[in-house]
Amino acid sequence: MIKNQGDRYHLIDKNALEEKKLDSNELTEFVKSSGLIDIGKKYNIVSIIGSQSTGKSTLLNYLFGTQFDVQNRQQSVGQTTVGIWISKDVKNNVVVLDVEGSDSVERKSGENMVENQTALMALAMSHCFIINVFVNALGQHTSCQLSIIKIIMQQNLKLFQQDTVKHIIFVVRDWDEEYNYDEASRKLNGYLLNIWNEIPKPDQYRETDFHELFSVQVVTLVYYKLKNEFAEQTNQLHSKLANQQDPNFIFKDFDYEKNVRWSDMPQYLSNIWVVIANNKDLNLPNEKILISNMRCQQIKLEALEGVKDLTEDLQNRVRTQFVENFGQQCLSILGVAQKIYDKDAKDYHADVYKEKEKELRDELMNKFYTYFQRQTESLKQHYMNRLSENLETLKRESIYDLPDKLNEVDLLKVNFEESLSKSVIEKGLWQEQDHVGFFNQQFDNQLKSFVEAQLASFKQQLDNIIKSECDKIVSQQVLNISPKFWSQIDADYYTMISDKYSKYDALLSGLRVQWKQIDDYLSKFEEDSFHNLKQVIAVASGRFKDQLFQQFKAQFVRTEDGQPRNWQKTTEEEIFHIYTEARDKVFSFLDILRIRKVKFIRIQQTMKKIAKTHLAPFTPLKEKISYQISADTDSDDVVLNEVFYTQVKMQLAEDIDVQYQDAIQKHKQDFLQNIPKPFWFLLLFFMYDDVLRWMGNPLFLYPILIILCFIGFCIAIGLHSLPKLAFQTVFRTINQALLPLIFGGISKLKTS
């Protein structure tokens, strides 16, 4: 059961004195029910001290409209107020303390400690002291409460930071015009100054003027039964204490921010009384800081609870995907928490307020940083997925379009950095640049792998293109072998490969390939391209014999204007001359092909390596040749090695000789066609029995069998033209030697 009666409360009662503690629950209930909790920090506390039974409670009731118990004049004089009562001005934010009177006869000897404790409690709470003194007691030490004032002065120096003035108002009761106000004021100020000079002071206050720390006023009141005048004077005093519009308002420069909020006052006063009641050193700033710590901690937790739903919602969303404007949403939550915190905490001790504000921010920032880590991973995954999608699309693009496309792809890095910048609350706070660097490295590695894969595919295509171009270049020369065969191949190949080289170089640079790797790519390109040229030449060498034979036929069989030659009208000497000229020409071409090697030279131009062929004259195989591709000289370096050269020359010679024999036969056909046909039948009639006899003769039969076996063997080993050449030689000999003898004998028989 709380003990408040109306709007008053017994703050320090017998239980508080005996148990040395306050009932904070009852005090809290009073603070709520009386409306004190609503005034926050905007208040002043006025307490009254004085001797017992001097009308202190009555004066307070007149001044502030309170309802403190007053002494019934018809009863015996005694103690009315025990300890400290607390109440509030009915209209203004002035809290009033009615302190137990001093010199109480009810207090036993040695119990003046209670008076000191209540005075100290009043001092800890009050901004202004009203010292109630009767005019006829001005010269009395105890009546003027000088001992209590001494305690107040001493403790005031210890308890308070001296940036505000403590107000002391002497209210001199039962004043009459016959008294000298100036004399009374001088006397009271003299008492205070003497006390100030007597009390020990800290070093910083030794030279301090008393009036810098205390504001002293002397107010006189007539006898209370002079109601009108007494009421007017009490109203004037009340205005000084409660009316902020009064020019004489004593709390004009008061810093209300230093007050303890009434919502925290029960705990604050409980802590103070425990210290005072146990005669311990009281430290009011520490007590205020303690209360501020406790309340700001509680308010901080309330602020965290107030944004709990918002933080959990943000956490749930960031778990599934990255959140747009993550940083702004974090700031919004911080703002809500700050608003909740400021609403109740901003009036507490400034340092504590800032400390707990920082703790609130740090706790939220720690949560946000955890979310930020997940946000960052989601952003990385999102943009890496977009990169993969873009690269999959680029696989279908021409590789020469990739440099421009890669510039477009690079925008993903910019977008990632922008999204990440929107995910932070303060630039650099969460080391977002480290995440940007890691993402860029991961991004570039995937891009590099893609480029390498595309280059590998392109290199295969480029090899095929080079092979095709080399085949065109070589084939063009093979179709018309000439002394410029090698020089033209060299020039055409160099022109083609230079163009491809420069484009390949530009492509590699556009694809962000590193300089050293570009050199490696280009060197490999040069070597592979030259190897392709060698392969094409090697394959084309199989066509050399046929092409040379065709070029021989073109010169031997046809005239310069392309018309077929008439061998019947051409003499054998002319045929032989044409044959010799055409044969020597193609053999000279064959020798050109034989005595050349294909060599690779790398020429350094403007820090670039350019592939070029070099057609070197044949060097005897015993002499070692140094190559920039290979240090070895093998048969592959020679276009026509000795074995292949001999084989081609033999086959070419055979085919050429066949053409020559055909021409001779066509020339001789005119002579045989002049023999009458009946003569051939007559010759066969007279010689058939001789033919049969020859067939039965082994000397004739065995040579025929040997000749047939020779023909079969030549066909089996691929020298099918050799029997033909042998028979042509035999028949040519017969035509030139035997037939003239035969037909000459026949002519003689006809003559005889």
UniProtKB/Swiss-Prot annotation:
Disulfide bonds: none annotated. GO terms for molecular function: GTP binding; GTPase activity. It is a multi-pass membrane protein. Its main location: endoplasmic reticulum. Residues 445-465 form a coiled coil. Pfam families: RHD3_GTPase (PF05879), Sey1_3HB (PF20428). Residues 1-674, 720-752 are cytoplasmic. One of its GO terms (cellular component) is endoplasmic reticulum. GTP binds at residues 50-57. Keywords: Coiled coil, Endoplasmic reticulum, GTP-binding, Hydrolase, Membrane, Nucleotide-binding, Transmembrane, Transmembrane helix. Its EC number is 3.6.5.-. It is found in: Endoplasmic reticulum membrane. Belongs to the TRAFAC class dynamin-like GTPase superfamily. GB1/RHD3 GTPase family. RHD3 subfamily. Probable GTP-binding protein that may be involved in cell development. This is Protein SEY1 homolog 1. It comes from Paramecium tetraurelia.
